[in-house]
Amino acid sequence: MEVVDPQQLGMFTEGELMSVGMDTFIHRIDSTEVIYQPRRKRAKLIGKYLMGDLLGEGSYGKVKEVLDSETLCRRAVKILKKKKLRRIPNGEANVKKEIQLLRRLRHKNVIQLVDVLYNEEKQKMYMVMEYCVCGMQEMLDSVPEKRFPVCQAHGYFCQLIDGLEYLHSQGIVHKDIKPGNLLLTTGGTLKISDLGVAEALHPFAADDTCRTSQGSPAFQPPEIANGLDTFSGFKVDIWSAGVTLYNITTGLYPFEGDNIYKLFENIGKGSYAIPGDCGPPLSDLLKGMLEYEPAKRFSIRQIRQHSWFRKKHPPAEAPVPIPPSPDTKDRWRSMTVVPYLEDLHGADEDEDLFDIEDDIIYTQDFTVPGQVPEEEASHNGQRRGLPKAVCMNGTEAAQLSTKSRAEGRAPNPARKACSASSKIRRLSACKQQ
């Protein structure tokens, strides 16, 4: 084909351009004929944790799935940006308080904090938690009735009371019990989460009196709706648990309003109706937990002794299953770290194939690490110290990083047969305790 000078094309009309061969290198194709290559998922490591896909996002930050490269346990990490926390009232204080509380709590029905990582340079905090497959609110939203069968609701409620009793025994008032803060594992274990607005009572406090509340409006008791200066913290949790039980068994809320002012007005009056299909035992329990006067409201001991709580409820309806993943529609909620794991395991070791967030990740503290002497050669063979940054567990980050890069360049065919977990650990520049 004859090559045409581009400067001469402006002298031709459209018809003349076609005659000189423009149609031979300008093609129009339908979008259905285009085959897009999927974007390669680059592996990203935060300390010893391999990052997966997004699980959810809230006002405080994002939650992603991660894999512990040492234990191969599935975890969830809450990623918090200090810049964003400053824009939220009491944001930083709530996060630090939640970390302090979770560090000393150990119960099967309370979410466990596994690790805390802090990135000084990017001003990011990573709260590594045990993995929960789904939230209770997500399960309720997945069915038209917006409720659980009585047998399933009873099982979840009993676990909620177990976890709540443990928190109260530790002198902690949750203040925000609701389905949105109750998570579930694949085995059906309920976990109380989000202790950001919780309050730890003084060890020598005479009672459970509280003065502040930041919980969700629909789950607040009349004493808070009416603006009382002080109130019983434990009875606030009992009320919120009662509203939660009402919601998961009926699909409704005892109090509603077009806006928060109308909602608080209705809560302050204390008038509500219980659907007739709840039955006398459940209705009596709800009335005891939603008692207007805090002094007359049920205690956890009274809830445990109630006939509806103690009764064994046979399954009359099919239980609400864990819904498919909202993004991938995966009904099994498979591990989202698998594509990243395959990338590390299947590809040659190259620095361009993975990302390490930083050479140094500070753990379990908000301060910069200490310094240790770096050896410097002298005339008599002895070495003197220069400062060298280290990880919180004493690992020399720069030395590990250099060693990792040197190993990656060394030709050794046997290394390709290593397991995925050992490869992740070798790529991680800074081991965590």
Swiss-Prot record:
Residues that bear Phosphoserine: 31, 325, 401, 428
Effect of substituting residue 232 to P: In sporadic cancer; somatic mutation; no effect heterotrimeric complex assembly with STRADA and CAB39
GO CC terms of this entry: centrosome; cilium; cytoplasm; cytosol; extracellular exosome; intracellular protein-containing complex; membrane; mitochondrion
UniProt-annotated stretches for the region Sufficient for interaction with SIRT1: 45-90
Outcome, altering residue 194 to Y: In melanoma; sporadic malignant; somatic mutation
Lipidation (S-farnesyl cysteine): 430
Effect of residue 97 to R: No effect on kinase activity
Effect of residue 170 to P: In sporadic cancer; somatic mutation; impairs heterotrimeric complex assembly with STRADA and CAB39
Listed InterPro entries: Kinase-like_dom_sf (IPR011009), LKB1_c (IPR039154), Prot_kinase_dom (IPR000719), Protein_kinase_ATP_BS (IPR017441), Ser/Thr_kinase_AS (IPR008271)
GO BP annotations, alphabetical order: activation of protein kinase activity; anoikis; autophagy; axonogenesis; cellular response to UV-B; dendrite extension; DNA damage response; epithelial cell proliferation involved in prostate gland development
Outcome of mutating residue 171 to S: In colorectal cancer; somatic mutation; impairs heterotrimeric complex assembly with STRADA and CAB39
Recorded superkingdom: Eukaryota
Residues involved in ATP binding: 55-63, 78
Effect of residue 48 to Q: No effect on basal nucleocytoplasmic localization, but fails to translocate to the cytoplasm when coexpressed with SIRT1
Keyword Acetylation attributed: yes
Outcome after substituting residue 231 to L: In cervical cancer; somatic mutation
Pfam families in the cross-refs: Pkinase
Effect of residue 194 to A: Loss of kinase activity
Compositionally biased tracts (Basic residues): 423-433
UniProt effect for mutating residue 86 to G: In sporadic cancer; somatic mutation; no effect on kinase activity nor in heterotrimeric complex assembly with STRADA and CAB39
One example GO MF annotation: LRR domain binding
Tissue: Ubiquitously expressed. Strongest expression in testis and fetal liver.
Function: Tumor suppressor serine/threonine-protein kinase that controls the activity of AMP-activated protein kinase (AMPK) family members, thereby playing a role in various processes such as cell metabolism, cell polarity, apoptosis and DNA damage response. Acts by phosphorylating the T-loop of AMPK family proteins, thus promoting their activity: phosphorylates PRKAA1, PRKAA2, BRSK1, BRSK2, MARK1, MARK2, MARK3, MARK4, NUAK1, NUAK2, SIK1, SIK2, SIK3 and SNRK but not MELK. Also phosphorylates non-AMPK family proteins such as STRADA, PTEN and possibly p53/TP53.
Full protein name: Serine/threonine-protein kinase STK11
Annotated source species: Homo sapiens (Human)
Lineage: Eukaryota, Metazoa, Chordata, Craniata, Vertebrata
